[in-house]
Structure formats: structure tokens, C-alpha cells
Amino acid sequence: MTICDTVDQYTIMSGDRLKIKDLLCNRLTECGWRNEVRLLCRNILLEKSANNSVSVDQLISEVTPKARTLVPDAVKKELLMKIRTILAETDEDN
């Protein structure tokens, strides 16, 4: 089991996963990331639909790498700090 799997499993069991997910969604909305990704999807669909239809899986595979690079470093750092805080609190409790 990797560190990521362990952290993921712990956050699910402790109930903190939902808090982290909500924080992420809020920050991505606040910084405009969701709108950027929506625009990216729209542009890809317009580009590809001229030739043929695009499946959801094709759209996801094309958008995901680009969308990940658009996540601001500040959001990544904030989430990492939140996860570290949760793990540190757990370590102190044990």
C-alpha cells in the first residue's frame, strides 16, 4: 500500500475526505479553474465535433492533463497543508 493509498484510506475512515473535497471544490471555483475547464471542454467539443462525435471518455482523456496543470499552486499548497494538519492531529492523538 502506497502513502497516497494510506492517506486516502485514513481520510475516508476519519470523515475528513469530505471536508478536503469541499475545500478543493470551493477553492477551484473561487480561482476560476472550473470556468477555465468548462471553456476548455467547449473548445475541444467545437473543434472535434466538426469532424465527428466525441465520446465522454475521449473528452476526459484530453481534458484531464490540461486541467491538472491549470490548478493554481496556491490551491495545491493549501490542500497539502490541510492534509498534513489532519495527519499531524491524528498522530498526536495516538
Swiss-Prot record:
This is Enhancer of yellow 2 transcription factor. The gene is e(y)2. It comes from the Eukaryota. Involved in mRNA export coupled transcription activation by association with both the AMEX and the SAGA complexes. The SAGA complex is a multiprotein complex that activates transcription by remodeling chromatin and mediating histone acetylation and deubiquitination. Within the SAGA complex, participates in a subcomplex that specifically deubiquitinates histone H2B. The SAGA complex is recruited to specific gene promoters by activators, where it is required for transcription. Required for nuclear receptor-mediated transactivation. Component of the nuclear pore complex (NPC)-associated AMEX complex (anchoring and mRNA export complex), composed of at least e(y)2 and xmas-2. Component of the SAGA transcription coactivator-HAT complexes, at least composed of Ada2b, e(y)2, Pcaf/Gcn5, Taf10 and Nipped-A/Trrap. Within the SAGA complex, e(y)2, Sgf11, and not/nonstop form an additional subcomplex of SAGA called the DUB module (deubiquitination module). Component of the THO complex, composed of at least e(y)2, HPR1, THO2, THOC5, THOC6 and THOC7. Interacts with e(y)1. Interacts with su(Hw) (via zinc fingers). The lineage of its organism: Eukaryota, Metazoa, Ecdysozoa, Arthropoda, Hexapoda. Pfam families: EnY2. Belongs to the ENY2 family. GO terms for biological process: chromatin organization; mRNA export from nucleus; positive regulation of transcription by RNA polymerase II; protein transport; transcription elongation by RNA polymerase II. Disulfide bonds: none annotated. GO terms for cellular component: cytoplasm; DUBm complex; nuclear pore; nucleoplasm; SAGA complex; transcription export complex 2. GO terms for molecular function: chromatin insulator sequence binding; transcription coactivator activity. It is found in: Nucleus, Nucleoplasm; Cytoplasm. The keyword Transcription regulation applies. InterPro entries: TF_ENY2 (IPR018783), TF_EnY2_sf (IPR038212). Keywords: Activator, Chromatin regulator, Cytoplasm, mRNA transport, Nucleus, Protein transport, Transcription, Transcription regulation, Translocation, Transport.
